[in-house]
Amino acid sequence: MCMVIFAPLFAIFAFATCGGYSGGLRLSVDCVNKTESNLSIDIAFAYPFRLHQVTFEVPTCEGKERQKLALVGDSSSSAEFFVTVAVFAFLYSLAATVVYIFFQNKYRENNRGPLIDFIVTVVFSFLWLVGSSAWAKGLSDVKVATDPKEVLLLMSACKQPSNKCMAVHSPVMSSLNTSVVFGFLNFILWAGNIWFVFKETGWHSSGQRYLSDPMEKHSSSYNQGGYNQDSYGSSGGYSQQASLGPTSDEFGQQPSGPTSFNNQI
């Protein structure tokens, strides 16, 4: 039930916080010649974080000449892979929820439904682990590439001590951090569901039968041995009791002694 409730929600949060991100930073370059300064240089970037395609112009503080620069790095592969896994996990979890609720009988026919569900769950657990780890590394690269201090080092005007370069504001990465957290939460959720899905498959039931058969054979042989022992003991006890008492012939011969003695007298 937890899988049915939380899997679609966690998947939505994962791809929404990553795929819907857009941010930016603002820098300022204050030249010695104030007319050449630019105190508001906006640099915007967004998903899928092809930072090398993000270009911007900055003053050189050498006349009216301007310098065209671009951010460094490309984290699009890890970001797109992460979002793709999240979208497909969301779609599959929705389909699985519908099957669990409305088609429970067909789901259990011929063990095909639980078997497919088990395989898909294992695959998505692996994909969530790989995708979340790759995106965590990609996010780290994005943070470095969009750090205002790193961007200022790209500007030739900022290499001159007479010019003043500073960051007005840095990009906000809270939603991207949240996407990584939800990525690993999805991995924990899907990996934890492997055991519960495995219990629905025929592999688990066949394993239970394999373990129970030797125990049943052992218990049946034990009961059979106990029965033979009881029967042997009962027969032995009966014959032993029969031999303890005097026989009917002995009871019949006891009065014959005194009778013959009286006749002789």
UniProtKB/Swiss-Prot annotation:
InterPro entries: Marvel, Synaptophysin/porin. Intrinsic membrane protein of small synaptic vesicles. Probable vesicular channel protein. Residues 1-202 form the MARVEL domain. Sequence repeats lie at residues 210-214, 222-226, 227-231, 232-236, 238-242. It comes from Rattus norvegicus. It comes from the Eukaryota. This is Synaptoporin. Disulfide bonds: none annotated. Residues 244-265 have a biased composition (Polar residues). Belongs to the synaptophysin/synaptobrevin family. Central nervous system. Residues 224-243 have a biased composition (Low complexity). The chain crosses the membrane at residues 5-25, 82-102, 115-135, 178-198.
